[in-house]
């Protein structure tokens, strides 16, 4: 076969297209830390009653793998429940994400011989300095998981459906800021929206600013513009200089050349924020790169 300049050009173009089909839909810039919040819906898919099985859990974990976040807040986890074959959902998600996460689980309430709660996943390159789990006032059980790192603190939560409880929980979280001497991120399913008047966000916005994408809704299938309830908020400390590089509510993602509609994975969309921390040392960056 005669090899011409045109055939080489076509070959290179084909290779480029093939490469792009496998590229990450939401690539991370060098030097950023990706924070993510995602309500798992107990890994039963995007509908109710859904199906509790390993396949749905693996599909969920595959989304985490593709998004490659460094710190993750997860809601609606179960652990050792009799009717759910005593699975530990956070363990399963971490294992099947293949990202070697450190796991932090917080029990919100007892459930069927086990428990339900929230979790935080942390890449091993980012050393945890302290963990605090704080019960929030609620009839059904709500918890705040605070994970402290060298340069910031990360709070993970899932607030109540009841308006009064939710406002009390927001006030308790804001009070916790008095005991933290570093910038704080709050991530989770707030069951509340910055678009709603005189509820939890009226409390939060006295101390936090919204860092995450708020374009549209975080619950699939909602036509009205009132279903943005999953957030990552930021409370600065001493003008830290932390930068918000980018944020997205992720509704579709391409994995191995296939587009995945995330409404089929959970009844919430994942939300991420990429941040940069001034002065991240070369040693920290090298450790991050080596472990990833």
Where are these regions (language model features)?
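N-terminal, active-site-proximal structural segment of metallo-dependent hydrolase catalytic domains
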Residues: 2-10, 19-95, 110-112, 267, ...
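Active-site environment of divalent metal-dependent phosphoester hydrolases
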Residues: 42-46, 79-82, 111-113, 162-165, ...
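Active-site neighborhood of phospho(di)ester-bond hydrolases with catalytic His/Asp-centered motifs
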Residues: 72-75, 104-107, 185-189, 212-215
């Amino acid at each position: 076969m005669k090899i011409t300049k045109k055939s080489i050009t076509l070959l290179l173009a084909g290779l480029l297209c093939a490469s792009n089909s496998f590229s990450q839909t939401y690539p991370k810039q060098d030097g950023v830390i990706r924070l993510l919040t995602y309500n798992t819906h107990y890994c039963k898919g995007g509908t109710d009653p859904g199906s509790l099985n390993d396949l749905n859990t693996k599909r969920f974990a595959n989304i985490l793998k593709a998004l490659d976040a460094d710190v993750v807040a997860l809601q609606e986890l179960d652990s050792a429940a009799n009717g759910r074959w005593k699975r530990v959902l956070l363990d399963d998600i971490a294992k099947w994400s293949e990202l070697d996460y450190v796991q932090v689980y917080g029990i919100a309430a007892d459930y069927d011989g086990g428990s339900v709660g929230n979790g935080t996943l942390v890449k091993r390159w980012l050393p945890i300095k302290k963990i605090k789990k704080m019960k929030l006032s609620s009839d059904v059980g709500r918890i705040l998981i605070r994970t402290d790192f060298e340069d910031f603190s990360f709070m993970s939560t899932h607030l109540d459906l009841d308006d009064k409880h939710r406002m009390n929980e927001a006030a308790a979280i804001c009070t916790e800021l008095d005991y933290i001497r570093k910038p704080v991120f709050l991530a989770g399913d707030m069951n509340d929206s910055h678009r709603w008047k005189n509820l939890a966000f009226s409390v939060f916005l006295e101390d936090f600013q919204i860092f995450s994408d708020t374009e549209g809704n975080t619950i699939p299938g909602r036509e009205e513009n009132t279903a943005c309830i999953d957030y990552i908020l930021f409370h600065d400390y001493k003008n830290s200089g932390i930068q918000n590089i980018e944020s997205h509510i992720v509704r579709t993602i391409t994995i191995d050349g296939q587009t995945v509609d995330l409404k089929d994975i959970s009844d919430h969309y994942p939300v991420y924020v990429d941040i940069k921390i001034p002065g991240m040392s070369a040693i920290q960056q090298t450790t991050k790169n080596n472990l990833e």
